[in-house]
Amino acid sequence: LVECELKKDGRTILWIHAPGIIRNGRFDVEGCNALTGIHCIMAEGQRSSLITEVLIDGQRFSYGTPRNINPRLYGADPEGKALGWIVEGSWIPYRKGANGAMLVEKKFPEWTSIWSSSPNMPSGLLSRFAERAGVHLYSTRGDQVFPSKNWIAVHCKWDDVLELRLPEPGTWRDAFTNETLVENSDRLRLKTHRGENVVLERIDPRPNPENGK
């Protein structure tokens, strides 16, 4: 199913930790390599933490788990682009071509593979990969957004200005007060408070393609 239905049409697939590594009841890193298309090696020895350090657009952060984890995989693919590294240091820790890469991106003719050795990827990084893959993001603040054809509900996380990015220009009003908040625009800016629920109603419904209305 993955090979026939997912790895095509320009899709991006994000893999976490060690997908496909169980073969015939044991750890087999070649199963992971075949599934993700990214060559990795499995570290030998004792269990240890899995924390990845990332530097993107000048912003440095780490994610993963401090718990002892096994198996531990490290990227060793010269055709892949390393986006994150083992946090413990810049030394080359393992053999077989691995250099400590723990977040790797590799492009194929029909799809893109992104693999993260560490779990617990933060929402900001997930959102970045989703947006690059063509997913429409309504908010970059981490608000919960529940969209439908002519309604949008938002559960707000911050005491700040919400900038809601709409998929297309339209006119929207506050469903509680009937106040028009934006006209013929694909951007809405609204002062919000943490825990507030915003419900928007579109008042220029999308045309029905069957009758042009």
Features from the language model and the residues they span:
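A conserved amphipathic helix/loop scaffold
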Residues: L1-K213
